[in-house]
Amino acid sequence: MKTQRDGPSLGRWSLVLLLLGLTMPLAITAQVLSYQEAVLRAVDGLNQRSLDANLYRLLNLDPRPTLDGDPDTPKPVSFTVKETVCPRTIQRSPEECDFKKDGLVKRCVGTVILNQARDSFDISCDKDERKVARLGGFLQKAREKIARGFKKIGQKINDFLGKLAPRTEA
C-alpha cells in the first residue's frame, strides 16, 4: 500500500507552502497606506459621519511629521477640508467635486493608522478660526467707523443747539 509520503504530492505541498510563506510579507507590506491615503480615508469617514448637506474635500495637508515604521501605531495628522458643491447623498468621490465658492472650511486634527486592515482614525474638525478672525477684524473696523460717525453727528447737534441758545448781552 502506498502512503502520501511516498508520492510526489508531499513535495508539491512543501513547495506551495514555501512560496506562500515567502509572499506573505509582501502581502502585509502592500496593505500599508501612505500618509496621504490614510488622510483621504479619514476625510471619507468624516463625510460619512457629517450632518452637513455637502461633501468635504481635502484642501491642505500639513507637512507629514516624522513617522516610526510601525503601521499599527497611531500617526498624528492635521489638515484642512473645504465644502464642495456635491451633495452628500450622491455616491461620488469628493476628489471629483469642485470646491464651493465661499464654502465652509474646517481645520482637522487627530490620528490615523496606516495599516489598511485596521483602517482606523480619530479626527475632530472645527471651523477654520482664521476665517473667523478675519471676520472679527472686519467687524472691529466697522464698529470704529460707526463710532466715529456718531461722534461727528453728536458734535454737529451740539454745535446746532449752541447756535439756538438765547444769547444774553451784558
UniProtKB/Swiss-Prot annotation:
Q: Does the keyword Ribosomal protein apply?
A: no
- What's a single GO CC term here? vesicle
Q: What does this protein do?
A: Antimicrobial protein that is an integral component of the innate immune system. Binds to bacterial lipopolysaccharides (LPS). Acts via neutrophil N-formyl peptide receptors to enhance the release of CXCL2. Postsecretory processing generates multiple cathelicidin antimicrobial peptides with various lengths which act as a topical antimicrobial defense in sweat on skin. The unprocessed precursor form, cathelicidin antimicrobial peptide, inhibits the growth of Gram-negative E.coli and E.aerogenes with efficiencies comparable to that of the mature peptide LL-37 (in vitro).
The cross-references to Pfam families, in alphabetical order and at most eight, read: CAP18_C, Cathelicidins
Q: State the similarity comment.
A: Belongs to the cathelicidin family.
The name of this protein is: Cathelicidin antimicrobial peptide
Domain of life of the source: Eukaryota
Gene3D superfamilies from the entry?
3.10.450.10
Segments for region (Active core): 150-162
Instruction: Output the PANTHER family linked to this UniProt entry.
Output: CATHELICIDIN (PTHR10206), CATHELICIDIN ANTIMICROBIAL PEPTIDE (PTHR10206:SF2)
Q: Which gene encodes it?
A: CAMP
